[in-house]
Amino acid sequence: MRTLWIVAVWLMGVEGNLFQFGKMIKHKTGKSALLSYSGNPCYCGWGGQGPPQDATDHCCFVHDCCYGEENACYPKTAFTLKFENQIIICDEDPCNYAVCMCDRVAAICGGENVATSDAKYLFYRSMGCEEESVQC
């Protein structure tokens, strides 16, 4: 029960429309975003600091940077997306499009690096995450 509570609190702090981002990740990786990528190790999940620890963590780092660049748009916005022939198509509204594209790029990156994702990083915070953060 404690684990469920921790996950619920974690979900409240995640930027972006988590459900839609999760659909993209599932579409591109075949894996559940929550079960396979939470806390991998420095940037996947809420917050982030230190240098990315692996290719998957780097995808999440780039995602965080993208949200930072789109600061004029509310990153928790719901947007329209669809899947056509394995391609993620984003809504055309400027802010929705910007946020959706941040999620889309991260999901594609995750799909390209699915083989490098290591289960040992699930809900794991590495000592390397305490090092100085890299710039976007």
From Swiss-Prot:
Residues 1-16 form the signal peptide. Its cofactor is Ca(2+). The keyword Hydrolase applies. It is found in: Secreted. InterPro entries: PLipase_A2, PLipase_A2_dom, PLipase_A2_dom_sf, PLipase_A2_His_AS. SMART domains: PA2c. Its EC number is 3.1.1.4. Glycosylated (2.5%). One of its GO terms (cellular component) is extracellular region. One of its GO terms (molecular function) is calcium ion binding. Belongs to the phospholipase A2 family. Group II subfamily. D49 sub-subfamily. Negative results: does not show cytotoxic activity on human fibrosarcoma and melanoma cell lines. PANTHER family: PHOSPHOLIPASE A2 FAMILY MEMBER, PHOSPHOLIPASE A2, MEMBRANE ASSOCIATED. This is Acidic phospholipase A2 CC-PLA2-2. It comes from Cerastes cerastes.
